[in-house]
């Protein structure tokens, strides 16, 4: 995405670190968590590559259509898997947002808005609202619950890759990253 270099590199670092943690979560003994972690790792690394500042690297013209194909496939997979759990609907929205941003970058790789008008396009605004709500809800879910003193012992017995609060923090950071990327579209 085309924005200032320093925040762009911070976003790259955040998304790459999140993607790396999600790869480690793929070693979980829980199959559903492994699958979700794989989807989230793809999203984290994809966001990291897309967030590289344009001043540092200008990708060839074929990159954005390739992104659209990869994340279009991820969206179709999320749609198929959403039959078994509503969490995959968020993966569907995230993959669709990546397809949308890749399409915007394909049509105008050097400008933020390819739509010619002033203001925020309707789809961008809808995605911004969705991810803002997702970030707020995810942040609230990370707040400690009163009476959860016994959960500290349970958490120490779990493998660090299987801890749900770390997975929630991972999803929260990717939601924040998606918000930042959508603001530059």
Language-model regions: role of each:
Residues 1-185:
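Alpha-helical membrane segments of multi-pass proteins
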């Amino acid at each position: 995405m085309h924005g200032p270099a320093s925040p762009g590199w911070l976003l790259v670092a955040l998304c790459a670190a999140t993607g790396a943690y999600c790869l480690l979560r793929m070693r979980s003994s829980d199959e559903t968590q492994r699958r979700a972690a794989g989807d989230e790792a793809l999203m984290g690394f994809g966001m990291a590559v897309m967030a590289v500042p344009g001043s540092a690297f200008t990708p060839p013209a074929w990159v954005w259509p390739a992104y659209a194909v990869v994340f279009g496939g991820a969206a179709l997979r999320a749609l198929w898997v959403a039959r078994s759990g509503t969490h995959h609907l968020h993966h569907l929205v995230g993959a669709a947002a990546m397809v949308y941003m890749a399409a915007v970058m394909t049509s105008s790789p050097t400008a933020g808005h390819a739509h010619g008008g002033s203001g925020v396009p309707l789809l961008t605004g809808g995605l911004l609202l969705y991810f803002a709500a997702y970030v707020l809800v995810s942040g609230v879910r990370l707040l400690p619950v009163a009476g959860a003193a016994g959960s500290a012992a349970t958490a120490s017995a779990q493998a660090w890759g299987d801890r749900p609060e770390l997975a929630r923090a991972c999803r929260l950071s990717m939601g924040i990253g998606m918000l930042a990327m959508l603001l530059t579209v």
